[in-house]
Amino acid sequence: MIKKLEEMSLEELWQLFPIFLVEHKSEWKDWYELEKANLIKILGANVIKRIEHIGSTAIPNIWAKNIVDILLEVGRKEDLARVRDLLVKNSWLVMSESHNRISLNKGYTEQGFAEKVFHLHLRMTGDHDEIYFRDYLCQHPDIAQAYQELKLSLWKKFEHNRDAYTDAKTDFINHYVSEAKSSNFQESEKFYQKSLDRRKN
């Protein structure tokens, strides 16, 4: 009898859903746009203060897990629970909850990854370091390539330990988030708006 995901231990989940990196796929952008439309349909545009494609799949030309990360910001604390409950009713699974942060996923099954997999990072307005990191790497392809090399070096070492894989990237990410905030705060935001306009066209 196959266990349900919520019945599995962390080690069992890591075995079923290993770290697996692939070359950049242009269709990741399309996955994001379709899922963004689904989220707006489910939640309504008014509750969503910001929605973004984040993570390595949003950075051109680098290897990434075949999982599209989405950041969704809401304006009120009470909206976090309401949005979470609506998403759970629409095929999303809660991965973790902490202070003013909820992580959900879609595309995880008892048989392994589905064809399309998403991670949703539900946050309060302004909690978006991932945007600084994405934009900085988009503006600095050499740093993006260094990040790719770091991930490739960690892949097999931590293939079945996602927490260790994530922790090993933290110092690199935090360093360039700080760089983006301290040296290029306004330009990073302007770059994002320009890139958003390009995506719409």
Give the positions of each predicted feature.
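Helical scaffold of the NTase/Pol beta-like nucleotidyltransferase catalytic core
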Residues: M1-E52
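Short amphipathic alpha-helical segments
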Residues: F17-I19, N66-I70, K116-F118, F133
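Active-site nucleotide-donor binding segment shared across nucleotidyl transfer reactions
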Residues: L39-I70, V74-E78
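A contiguous binding-surface segment within folded domains or other stable secondary-structure elements
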Residues: E78, D85, M95
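Short amphipathic alpha-helices in soluble, non-transmembrane regions
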Residues: R82-N90
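Conserved catalytic core of two-metal-ion nucleotidyltransferases
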Residues: W92-T125
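Catalytic cores of NTP-dependent nucleotidyl/adenyl transfer enzymes across multiple folds
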Residues: M124, H128-N201
